[in-house]
Amino acid sequence: MSRNFYADEGAFVGSSKGPLLPDILHTEDVSTKTLPTGNQIYDSKALDSWFSGIRKYVTHKYYIYKTELDTQKSAAANEWKSVQDYVSQHVLTDDYEKQELLVPSSALALGAFFTGRVLSNRRNWGFDSPLNTTKAGILTRNPSALGRVLTSIPSRVLLPWVLTGTVLSQLTPVTWNNSVKALEQDVLPADLVARYHEIWNQLLVDGVQKTSASVHRNVDASLQQGIGEVRRYLVKKLDL
């Protein structure tokens, strides 16, 4: 026969008055809230205050960084707008070049830049060739004088940019001149620009152009002298 627990005389029923709180809790630090269902929620005031402080701190920092980010984004947008306005007013002043020549000339300038990189690459002139050794015998491949000039450090630095500038100056001369003028006036220091023009005048105006003019005068004088001698010779021979 099964046992009937309700018939036990020694059964003990504990008290159910009020909530059972551990002795470790201090009731003055715990707030109680009763739900409509009759359940009670216990909340530690210390933990609630601590989490509230953390939440306020994180929220405060978030708004600070968000405001700073929005400010930087606005400043960057204003700077970009200023650059666009400056370029439109001082560089891209020729409508025909801007609408018809800017894109193709930029593509050709990019090709000129990489052409300069190829021409100044040591590998393309045999410096790294396996035949560039004395063991190759009659097959020894030595770089030419032109290759040594084009692969020098100044050429490797300047040649790509010189070719790029040459293409742009020939295809879009107005835009190129405006770019150089804007660079000299608003970007580079005035002392550097003055020194650059001085060196340019010494090398080009006082050097190359004067030498070219002198050679032209000498050649012209020689031609005129030669033509005069031929005329005198013909007059003498023909008894004119």
Curated annotation (Swiss-Prot):
Keyword Mitochondrion appears in the UniProt entry: yes
Assembly information from the UniProt record: Component of the mitochondrial contact site and cristae organizing system (MICOS) complex.
Mode of membrane association: Multi-pass membrane protein
Descriptive protein name: MICOS complex subunit MIC27
Name of the coding gene: MIC27
Keyword Transmembrane helix among record annotations: yes
Family: Belongs to the apolipoprotein O/MICOS complex subunit Mic27 family.
Function: Component of the MICOS complex, a large protein complex of the mitochondrial inner membrane that plays crucial roles in the maintenance of crista junctions, inner membrane architecture, and formation of contact sites to the outer membrane.
